Amino acid sequence: MTSVRYTKDHEYVRVEGDVAVVGISDYAQQQLGDVVFVELPEIGKVVTKGGEAAVVESVKAASEVYAPLSGEVVEVNSELEGAPGLVNEAPEGKGWFMKLKLSNPAELDELLNEHAYKDFLDTLA
Amino acid sequence: MNREGRGATTPHSIALSGPETFTGNRALDLEEGLIFEIGRIEVTGVDIAEPAPFRDRLGTQARTAPLDLPGLSEPEAMRHYVRLSRMNYGIDSGLFPLGSCTMKHNPRLNEKMARLPGFADIHPLQPQSTVKGALGLMAELSRYLLELTGMQAVALTPKAGAHGELCGMMAIKAAHAARGDGDARHVVLVPESAHGTNPATAALIGYQVRAIPARADGTVDPEAVKAALGPEVAALMLTNPNTCGLFERDVVAIAEAVHAAGAYFYSDGANFNAILGKVRIADLGVDAMHINLHKTFSTPHGGGGPGAGPVVLSDALAPFAPVPALVATADGLVLVEDEGADGAEQALGRMSAFHGQMGMFVRALAWMLSHGADGMRQASEDAVLSANYIRACLMDLMSAPFAERPAMHEALFDDTWLAGTGLTTLDVAKALIDEGYHPMTVYFPLVVHGAMLIEPTESESKASLDLFIAALRDLAMAAKAGDKERFLGAPYYAPRRRLDETRAARAPVLRWVKPAQVADAAE
């Protein structure tokens, strides 16, 4: 079963086997506006939950993308270099940022599930 | 290729009264190509004699294709730049409400003083004995900056605000190193309401940045600072007044907590113009602060001239000020050029090749002297009054966050008032261009949704402010009345229509390329 979890900083995590796909949520891309540049980490980089993992730049602002979970970067979406607009078109699909090999899968429980994230978004409106 | 933004069509609701012209010019609004589009290699503005016959030694390196330099005659060159300048908008053409960067009138007296030959025609490599007057001016400027801030030392060499930040933070790093805790302290605290250059500066010299969230009222909570402090923290960087245009009222408590934890307090002085003559920076517990001469003291900037970002330092940081440093000796003023020399034993090094922006020093001191203590205080008061006047006059139509407190020198609005109109902050900014104003700062500060930040400065009369307010009120009412076309297609009347910002960022054209196909087809 695949389930998507979210952070309050609007990153999402989708666990597929022993790796987690990380990106920014649909709400985040809407807030940012047209994404024009994505800076991805190097493969092999070890990230800790809440630490800086990537940078996303839109016509409005440059923002940090925090690692929702601790782990090692095993793959990055290099398509974003030439086509940053994928983040707007399909944030949870082709617009993913990186894949992490989790070092502490238990951290997953600390993240919001889809329902809780939706409730959280309602509080921001 | 540079003409793409120019719209050929006019919307139905805002029809121009005349036909499209054959030339693309619209009376005094003249169309103008890039210099590479209008220049021709065979044309020149000067008569240069043909070189005598010579044998070159270029061999296979000799150029075979034409050089394609854009030649223009003198009247053509003159017209090119005058036409481009007419598409520009500056503080000398109208109110420039950019909240992120103070754009105030640069008095012509400043310019007259800066052009005095004794200041304008000197060179940094002249012997010091021949520039005593210039050194005297720098000393007088330093005395004024220290008097206005209550601080102990000033470094004049940084070339602009962010460079000044870097200088101040390098002084802090040098102080920690001298104290022996340089390695242990690797974190710098930066509130969310700080200028974006603050975290960038800290990161540039190897610090890890830790963000401090803002309170609901838009200011920094001393408790949040205390919670983030520790033996690993080197400094706190605080912008005051902050980017929401609010004075950090708890700044003294924050400074005390920072010092108690063994860290230094850096204050971003970009907004010093709001508190000049009202607050002595030293009384707030500040260890280092840069002063943008080009903002607070009216010297031109933003394409109009170089900046200057002197840094004032506390007792603790004064020994680490960079060279060249101005030192008073028995023989008069001396610029100490070498770190380690007398008067600069612990200097952090050199921030720039020479002594700083002399032309800006002259202008800033001219502004100080012509205003006097009462005039400088009034400049701050008028800047704050103007911002609050704008906010009060627009509050019923637009929405202002943190409105329970008076603003400082900036009036901040969010986009709540646009809800349901289908319009965004960007659309309002573009419509303001059609009304003859440079837009305010938009989407900054980041902590406010769809922010519109307006800084009128003390330069504007009440009549001028009233006209600006009327324009914004008319736009706000039009937005609420559903007149969307006025906004979505704006600007209609600018030399270029709305540009595609997304494409410009995703696929920037950074260099002019000769349109080969067009040239071939013409042959």
Curated annotation (Swiss-Prot), chain A:
GO terms for biological process: glycine decarboxylation via glycine cleavage system. GO terms for cellular component: cytoplasm; glycine cleavage complex. The keyword Transit peptide does not apply. Keywords: Lipoyl. Belongs to the GcvH family. It comes from Xanthobacter autotrophicus (strain ATCC BAA-1158 / Py2). CDD domains: GCS_H (cd06848). InterPro entries: 2-oxoA_DH_lipoyl-BS, Biotin_lipoyl, GCV_H, GCV_H/Fam206, GCV_H_sub, Single_hybrid_motif. This is Glycine cleavage system H protein. Binds 1 lipoyl cofactor covalently. The gene is gcvH. PROSITE patterns: BIOTINYL_LIPOYL, LIPOYL. The glycine cleavage system catalyzes the degradation of glycine. The H protein shuttles the methylamine group of glycine from the P protein to the T protein. Transmembrane segments: none annotated. NCBIfam families: gcvH, PRK01202.1. The glycine cleavage system is composed of four proteins: P, T, L and H. Its cofactor is (R)-lipoate. Residues 19-101 form the Lipoyl-binding domain. SUPFAM superfamilies: Single hybrid motif. The modification N6-lipoyllysine is found at residue 60. The keyword Oxidoreductase does not apply.
